[in-house]
Structure formats: C-alpha cells, structure tokens
Amino acid sequence: MLFEGSEIYSEAIKFFKEILGIQAALKYENELEKIEKLSKFKEFKIAIKDKLPANLSAYKANFIELNAKTPCGYDLLKADEELACKLASKIIFAAFDSGADFLLASNEAEFYIFDTLAKKLEKSANRNLQDFYVLRASELMALENSEIPSGLKEHVLKVVII
C-alpha cells in the first residue's frame, strides 16, 4: 500500500509540496462535531470516512465507520490528480459497498473530492455510484430540521432521500 499510516502520508505530502512549490492547504475542521440531533435518520445507513465523533455516538442512527487508513486525496489534487482520485474512489466505493445509503462528508474538502469529482472517481474505479450520494453535515442538519438545502440541486451525485 502506498500510504500505510497517516504519518507517512503527511510526510510524503509535505515532501511533494516542497518540491512542487505548492502552498499549504487550509485545514478543514470536522463538521460532524456540529451535528446536534438525528431523529429522522434512524432508518438510514450513514457511512463516514473515519471514526464516529463522540457527539454522534449517542444517536440511534445507523453509522458505518469506514475507518479509512488513507486520506481522501484532496491534498494531492494539484500534485497528482490521478492518485488523488484513486485514493478517494477507494473510500467512496467502500462506503457504497458497505450498503450505506450515503456518505457523510466531514468537511468541504471531502465533499469536493467525493461529490464534485464523482464522475472522475467513477472513471478511476471503472464503476458506477448509481443511487448513492454524499451529504455535508450542514445539509444533514437542515434535512433533520425539515428544511431542504438549496445546495442539494448542485450535487453531482443527485440526492434522493424521501
């Protein structure tokens, strides 16, 4: 495996960024920690890339922790888009294959690579994400509050919840 642990990955990214003169990317906070309730999603299987944050463990939603050892690939996009897409496609198809209804992105970087670049990920894996989609934490919270986020229309992977 190319990046066995996150420390090795971080060092490799740092090395490539220095060589290629790429500015450090913004750090994205884990938006999953902002979720306050999930009563309407008890019947859904929700995949998350990493471990379940403590604030979500009390909810009765059916979370599937992918515990991905590899990063989503976002930091590699400018240096090696093909490798970034391979990393991301492994994660999104692990979520798809797990039987999850959707993947919950923990930040904008994950949303960008998993949804905005979904067609490239499908091509990279030579597979189709039929009837699968990605949600932002803010969109999930809005849906929980019976609101329809306007951004759902802009998703590459079309959201079909109800």
Q: Residues of each region from the PLM?
A:
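Iron-sulfur cluster-binding electron-transfer modules in prokaryotic oxidoreductases
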Residues: 1-162
